[in-house]
């Protein structure tokens, strides 16, 4: 970094901000590894509130809150990352769903997302490095002891096991940790033996 200054070792990171109409969007920063200094480099304004970001290789996957209730809002946006610049590569929606997290499988040919509000885990094929559409949906059917807040499933987090053989989803509404096996075409099958309730 710096044409006429001493070369610095920097890492790049991005932050999503709900904010107002003026400052809602994605901020890109440099982090000077040598001294910990953070330098704001760019801002990309967005109409919707970014909820979660997942950078995989040269692409970043963002989930947006559907604040309008319209079927075309919300969804997942895929950006190509070029240093601190982002270029929209693909965008998918699914009847206005708001997804709160995405993960990619080891081969990066399928993405998975969770919908807290509707209790769903969805499969998204990736072709020629771009997300295509929601191809499969697993509707979770959990519930637990709180008669108001736990009447239905609310998935809150997901990740792959370290060996990438199982997708783990935590369900706040069902007080459950659910393990899924990934099929050849991205389909998810619940592993009843490994999954467990917390209460």
Language-model regions, residue ranges each:
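Conserved beta-strand position repeated across blades of beta-propeller domains
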Residues: 52-54, 103, 159
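Residue position within the beta-strands of beta-propeller blades
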Residues: 15, 62-63, 113, 169
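Short loop/turn segments immediately following beta-strands, especially the blade-tip
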Residues: 29-36, 79-85, 123-133, 181-188
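Conserved loop/turn at the beginning of each blade in beta-propeller domains
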Residues: 46, 95, 151, 198-199
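An edge-strand/N-cap motif at the start of beta-rich repeat modules
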Residues: 3-31
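Short coil/turn segments that connect the beta-strands within blades of beta-propeller domains
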Residues: 10-11, 56-58, 107-109, 163-165
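Asp-box/WD-like beta-propeller blade repeats and closely related beta-sheet repeat scaffolds
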Residues: 86-157
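Short glycine/acidic-enriched loop and turn motifs that connect beta-strands
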Residues: 19-22, 66-70, 117-120, 174-176
């Amino acid at each position: 970094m710096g044409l006429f200054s001493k070369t610095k070792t920097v890492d790049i990171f991005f932050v999503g901000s709900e904010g107002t109409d003026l400052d809602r969007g994605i901020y890109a920063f440099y982090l000077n590894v040598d001294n910990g200094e953070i330098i704001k480099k760019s801002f990309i304004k967005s109409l919707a509130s970014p909820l979660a970001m997942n950078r995989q290789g040269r692409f970043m996957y963002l989930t947006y809150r559907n604040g309008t209730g319209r079927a075309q809002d919300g969804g997942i946006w895929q950006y190509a990352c070029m240093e601190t610049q982002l270029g929209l590569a693909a965008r998918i929606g699914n009847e206005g769903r708001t997804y709160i997290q995405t993960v990619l499988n080891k081969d990066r040919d399928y993405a998975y997302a969770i919908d807290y509000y509707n209790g769903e885990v969805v499969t998204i094929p990736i072709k020629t490095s771009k997300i295509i559409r929601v191809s499969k949906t697993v509707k979770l059917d959990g519930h637990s002891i709180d008669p108001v807040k736990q009447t239905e499933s609310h998935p809150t987090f997901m990740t792959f096991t370290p060996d990438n053989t199982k997708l783990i989803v935590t369900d706040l509404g069902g007080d459950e940790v659910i393990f899924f096996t990934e099929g050849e075409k991205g389909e998810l099958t619940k592993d009843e033996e490994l999954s467990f309730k917390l209460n």
